[in-house]
């Protein structure tokens, strides 16, 4: 509310007016109350014009408070007509799940990052709006860039840019990929501490439905066993499974070599130089261990027992020398009772290679041994059927294929064609049984508690879950992109989407699964009620209550006025 005046030849009148947006989206105003003329009010209040203006402004303030109170508490009456058709081309349903991701986006100060990037480039489009929408749609409606643009039009805050701006922005984002990663890492501390004393590293790859190699898209060993060119990704996460940094490298490159460039970037640009590196055996080469034995770094990596030197392998397979992890009590694995089946047992010894003094820890889990034995029993049954049928695959790519237990011998009489005889390879079965329940870890933490070391190693599932989320839920494979810069920007978007999602889930204290949170965010929608406001059309649950409490705004009122919606949008961008 505000004061307006109307002057004539002989008098000046004072009014309280209110500004509002009409049905056509234009700003206009209306008179709420006439206060009187200057002469009347001066006589009534016994003051001059300045005193009248001061009094009038106070009346406008009180009228504003009264209006707000009535709007907050009033029952909204909106007429509907059963004989009136809907208007053409009028959007009625809006998506609102992005609001919760938006609170993370602005918490990471990505709007400030975009302003810094703009100062180094010449473009007119709104990079902040484009990047934020790319992230939100990757979580809520993963698809091509054009489809994502259409999906963003369903948001309560639709795009003000055009599709061609999106493709132009991809080139800029690709050129600033390293800068964006380092900035969001530093800014993530505004949203809580990072467990960056433990860093997990792993690699995956993404295939392209093309027939020839192109740029970094090279033929390599696909995780999906596809015969297509691939691009590989290396990913670091912190100890909580929250993404830290990523890199892309050609599909035909040995993934062991991908670690050093990315780790160097973390050391130099992130200011993160004291951590324990943890990976599986595939990324635990001698050089990678040496790299993480320097400075204030250390490593905990899994070790293939089969690839140990003969003497160490023989020691690992012996059933003697084990202790119970819970109390360090020596045990004989051949005399375990049923009560001992749920325990974990270990033994350790110095393990010296050409370049490093390490510690080799062997663990034994009766429960895991029983599981492996049960799986193998099923595979042996299938192998026996293959022998009985005399049929065997020529090419066996899967190391867990039951056909690995089938061997063959050529039987022939002199001058006759050889006859192939298949048989069950019991020696192969016996060899595998020796490794049941066993697991090996190598570390340069020579004096640390074994239980603590194993706990860190067990956390590797989190980075595997990150890849699963990106590939399955965020549909990260860039089917519709060919240019190298746009592919980089696409994976940057996927990385940032994963970071937003993980940080949001962490703010909920990890109470909900990935599927539960994704389903909830996608379901949060609103319908426009005759341009008077919005009505939520989703189911209120504990998870929605927790989201509102965490992000400090609520969208679950029975009816939300347009003014309130704008307030919610503003709160979602509050740092």
PLM regions and their residue ranges:
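Anion-binding and metal-coordination hotspots
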Residues: 3-5, 11-13, 24-27, 108-575
